[in-house]
Amino acid sequence: MLKRTSIAHVNSILEKNLNWKILDIGCGYRANKNASVIADIQDFSDFYKEKKFVKIEGKNLPFEDKEFDFVIASHVIEHIDNFEFFIKELERISSKGYIELPSRLGDNLVFENKNDHIWWFYFDDTANKLIVSKKNQLIDPFITVATAKLFEEIFRESLVIELAWEEKIDYKIDNQIRQENFKKISFFKLF
């Protein structure tokens, strides 16, 4: 099951279940305060001295089946080449969790390394399914990451997708949107 949520709602649940073993994966320096285990491909062990830190090396996540009560993957999946395998790994190590992803709009507005994000996402509210396609840059980015964070306070639901999952992360690959069908929009050229 996959459904929309908010990080505020997720945190309220986590704070009521302090006995849960919670993993925050790929969070860099911004781990969820309720996480008991932090995992990343970079070594942040010096930063997370008060929590268990696990450095990820390779595709397989170094955890036992259903080791965690809850897994947080915020702004991670869009970076992973084999996202399908990663989703299966999340489902293997926990039975529920929270996923946060940039929306297609948010991903097009923000200046980032153009090769950093591989995938585009939107959520089909009728089917409760994550729709995934290769990222297409349809708008010349004009907002910095720092500015986007400020915008998120007001336009969060337009810039990010927040999902809670239990047992299974339902998704569908949809490659119907093709770059060649669009002329890239540049707001700088409009003025």
Regions found by a protein language model. Give the residues of each.
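Conserved SAM-binding loop and adjacent beta-strand
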Residues: M1-H9, E50
